[in-house]
Curated annotation (Swiss-Prot):
Renumbered ranges of motif Nuclear localization signal: 318-327
Name the UniProt record assigns to this protein: Minor capsid protein VP2
Lipidation (N-myristoyl glycine): 2
Entry annotated with the keyword Transmembrane helix: yes
Stretch list, region Disordered: 301-353
Keywords per UniProt: Capsid protein, DNA-binding, Host endoplasmic reticulum, Host membrane, Host nucleus, Late protein, Lipoprotein, Membrane, Myristate, Transmembrane, Transmembrane helix, Viral penetration into host nucleus, Virion, Virus entry into host cell
Annotated spans, D1: 262-297
Domain of life: Viruses
GO CC annotation terms, alphabetical: host cell; host cell endoplasmic reticulum membrane; host cell nucleus; membrane; viral capsid
UniProt feature, compositional bias: Acidic residues: 301-316
InterPro entries: Polyoma_coat_VP2 (IPR001070)
GO biological process, one term: viral penetration into host nucleus
């Protein structure tokens, strides 16, 4: 087998160097081509009085390819056929011997058809994983020790390796999907924050005053309205012979000027010195930094102060327990009290015999 592989390796190297196919080298066509090329080069050297390098350049053949063609032997196809026949006979005898011994060996293993394969119309086979009761991998080890069929160990090993590869790919796929999903969500949030910040930087800001009282706003609106509606104004103008008012006059006024804008625009300044950097006014800077996750020192101090106030409101110090002592009672008279039913202030009577 080693000789056959060596010859094949040499054939592929010659095919790469000469530009000929491996089939041409094995069939002997390359040897005929090499002889014709050598004869043509020799003719150019002798008749044309050229050097070998000039003859190779005239025939557009490199020196490496010419040397490789000279190394091709005419007996290469015969040697390859002999080696291949010898290897084929050896491998055939080994395969025959293996098949005979496998057939004559008494097999005690039962290979019953699984119940899942009895249903030929079923497209998928249900998979039930190993139930490792003692420790992870116990069923796999016990199967290797007690349940390996020596005649089908290759297919069983292929099944185990395929299952391990599939489980690894499944876990890796889930991990990659979770990672990329989180990454996309983070980048999307960053892009949204960046878009909002650019919008707030480039937008035109105005300072306006909103009415605090709805009724006062309605009062001013109706007070500024003309006393006549548009049809009455046109009829009055037609009778007086003056130009009839139209929509533009109502919107722009009698002098053709627009009403003043009810707001003041914030002047926008560019980057100093033409640096083309991002600029923002001071009152807008905390909002932009907050979108990017940063806080100014003043804003951070205010946030910490509010958090401390909330913590103090939520935290209630435990009330001190006051130890109550028993009230001092009046002293008890040591004299024995009168327990009889008679009056304690009775007079004693003495019996005189």
């Amino acid at each position: 087998m080693g000789a056959l592989l060596t010859i094949l390796a040499e054939v592929f190297e010659l095919a790469t160097a000469t530009g000929l196919s491996a089939e041409a080298i094995l069939t002997g066509e390359a040897f005929t081509t090499a002889e014709l090329l050598q004869a043509h080069i020799a003719n150019l050297v002798e008749v044309g009085e050229l050097s070998v390098a000039e003859a190779l350049a005239a025939t557009e053949v490199t020196s490496e390819a010419f040397e490789a063609l000279q190394s091709i032997s005419s007996v290469l196809p015969t040697a390859f056929i002999g080696v291949a026949a010898t290897e084929g006979a050896i491998l055939g005898s080994l395969i025959t011997l293996t098949a005979t011994s496998s057939a004559l060996y008494p097999s005690t293993w039962k290979h019953s058809t699984p119940s899942a394969n009895l249903n030929q119309e079923m497209a998928l086979v249900p998979y039930i994983g190993d139930l490792d009761i003692f420790f992870p991998g116990a069923e796999t080890i016990s199967r290797f020790v007690y349940s390996i069929d020596p005649f089908r160990w290759a297919s069983y090993l292929y099944n185990i390796v395929g299952r391990a590869v599939w489980e690894h790919l499944f876990r890796e796929t889930r991990r990659q999907i979770a990672y990329h999903t989180t990454d996309i969500a983070g980048r999307t949030a960053q892009s949204i924050h960046h878009t909002i910040a650019n919008f707030l930087e480039n937008v035109r800001w105005t300072v306006s005053h909103l009415g605090t009282n709805l009724y006062s706003g309605l009062h001013n609106y109706y007070r500024q309205l003309p006393p006549l509606n548009p049809p009455q104004s046109r009829e009055l103008a037609r009778r007086l012979g003056v130009p009839q008012p139209d929509r533009q006059i109502f919107e722009k006024g009698e002098e053709g000027m627009k009403h003043p804008v009810s707001a003041e625009y914030v002047e926008k300044y560019g980057a100093p010195g033409g640096a083309e950097q991002r600029v923002a006014p001071d009152w807008l800077l905390p909002l932009l930094l907050g979108l990017y996750g940063d806080l100014t020192p003043a804003w951070e101090a205010e946030v910490e102060e509010e958090e401390n106030e909330q913590d103090e409101e939520e935290y209630e110090p435990p009330q001190k327990r006051i130890k109550r002592t028993a009230k001092s009672s009046s002293k008890v008279n040591n004299k024995r009290g009168d327990r009889s039913a008679r009056s304690p202030y009775r007079t004693r009577q003495h019996n005189h015999n």
